[in-house]
A protein has these predicted regions:
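Active-site activation/catalytic loop segments of kinase-like enzymes and analogous catalytic loops
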Residues: 68-110, 126-146
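ATP/Mg2+ or Mg2+-diphosphate-binding catalytic cores
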Residues: 124, 129-171
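Amphipathic, well-packed alpha-helical segments that form the structural scaffold of globular domains
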Residues: 21-25, 46, 79, 103
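Catalytic activation segment of kinase domains across protein kinase-like and atypical kinase folds
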Residues: 46-84
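ATP-dependent phospho-/nucleotidyl transfer catalytic cores
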Residues: 1-42, 53-54, 149, 153-156, ...
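Secondary-structure capping and boundary motifs in well-ordered enzyme cores
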Residues: 37-42, 63, 67-74, 78, ...
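Short, surface-exposed acidic
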Residues: 13-14, 110-122
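Conserved acidic
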Residues: 37, 90, 94, 114, ...
């Protein structure tokens, strides 16, 4: 992480960089906090990876770019999507309602979940986008444009973690 912190200095806020240092220092506790129920997770679930089409008043959605697929709790994709899709202020204003709709959708499909359980998972997986910013930034060729994008991801998802007090769930 020190090389990432150096790379993001001046592009990501100091508190966001400190957050990453604390996350890395407590990564084993973070993984130990994972719930045991897993599903197929995209792990890069954002608007850029959704294709929409409309025909005869029906809307279809296709999800693309499955290179990071894995077994994770479903709330990890939910937290990543919400954190990546909204401005910080819009996320703050809408996230509880969106998580409630997510829970209602699962329950309607006979996947019994409670809002409190999913909300706790959503808070824990506020880390999803932040971790992706760290990992992806070292896997691709470094460019100024890429650094700006990964710093923006770290800032947005880091603020999500701070707002949700994610660290309290594993530190």
């Amino acid at each position: 992480f020190p090389s990432i912190a150096e790379r993001f200095t001046g592009k990501a806020g100091d508190e966001i960089i400190s957050l990453g240092e604390r996350l890395v220092a407590n990564i084993e506790r973070y993984y130990a906090a994972f719930p045991s129920t897993l599903t197929v997770a995209h792990r890069d679930f954002r608007l850029d990876n959704l294709l929409f089409s409309a025909r005869d008043s029906e809307i279809a959605v296709k999800v693309v770019d499955w290179q990071t697929v894995g077994a994770m709790p479903g709330a990890s994709d939910l937290a990543y999507f919400i954190g990546a899709s909204f401005t910080v202020e819009d996320r703050r204003n809408r996230e509880q309602a969106l998580v409630k709709i997510y829970c209602e959708g699962l329950n309607a499909q006979q996947v019994a979940v409670s809002f409190n359980d999913i909300w706790a998972q959503y808070r824990l997986f506020g880390t999803s986008g932040y971790i992706m910013a760290i990992v992806a930034s070292v896997l691709v060729k470094q460019t100024d444009r890429g650094d700006a994008m990964f710093a923006a991801m770290a800032n947005r998802h880091g603020q999500q973690m701070l707002d949700l007090e994610t660290e309290k769930l594993f530190v």
